[in-house]
UniProtKB/Swiss-Prot annotation:
This protein is one of the early assembly proteins of the 50S ribosomal subunit, although it is not seen to bind rRNA by itself. It is important during the early stages of 50S assembly. Keywords: Ribonucleoprotein, Ribosomal protein. One of its GO terms (cellular component) is cytosolic large ribosomal subunit. GO terms for biological process: negative regulation of translation; translation. This is Large ribosomal subunit protein uL13. It comes from Rhodococcus opacus (strain B4). Part of the 50S ribosomal subunit. Belongs to the universal ribosomal protein uL13 family. InterPro entries: Ribosomal_uL13 (IPR005822), Ribosomal_uL13_bac-type (IPR005823), Ribosomal_uL13_CS (IPR023563), Ribosomal_uL13_sf (IPR036899). Pfam families: Ribosomal_L13 (PF00572). CDD domains: Ribosomal_L13 (cd00392).
């Protein structure tokens, strides 16, 4: 008997909604990345996009542990001499909290075509409202110790 190999068409996708209020950013990103990749399913295969859709709400209320709010910096470069720009995590969280959460989750996905396809199933919103109520998302609870 041959081993079952999942195909992309065989996958049934569900929608999960995660409330990021007071959840540590890294722990949130790990759980979201596992749901996106499909590692919670018995039919997981690393070469197949078999994951679910993930909607993260309240990204502006995510917890940043330690001194990272002021002490950790995010960098990008324009390509021109002297074009290095840096912002602290606190500045990014105040201005674009959805981008900060999305960058944390996408950083835990594969860096190839499959990873880019998987990252398109991630939806992040700064507030409590999202336009995906028609998909009937299932609430996903992240278990953590209180800070």
């Amino acid at each position: 008997m041959s081993t079952y190999t999942p195909k992309a068409g065989d996958v049934t996708r569900t929608w999960h909604v995660i409330d990021a209020t007071d959840v540590v950013l890294g722990r949130l990103a790990v759980q979201a990345a596992n749901l996106l990749r499909g590692k919670h399913k018995p039919t997981f295969a690393p070469h197949v996009d078999g994951g679910d859709f993930v909607v993260i709400i309240n990204a502006d209320k995510v917890a940043i542990s330690g001194n990272k709010r002021e002490g950790k910096f995010l960098y990008h470069h324009s390509g021109h001499p002297g074009g290095l720009k840096s912002r602290s995590v606190g500045e990014v969280l105040d201005k674009n909290p959805d981008r900060l959460v999305e960058k944390a989750v996408v950083g835990m996905l594969p860096k190839n075509k499959l990873g880019r396809a998987i990252s398109s199933k991630l939806k992040v919103y700064a507030g409590p409202n999202h336009p995906h109520a028609a998909q009937q998302p299932v609430p996903f609870e992240i278990k953590q110790v209180a800070q």
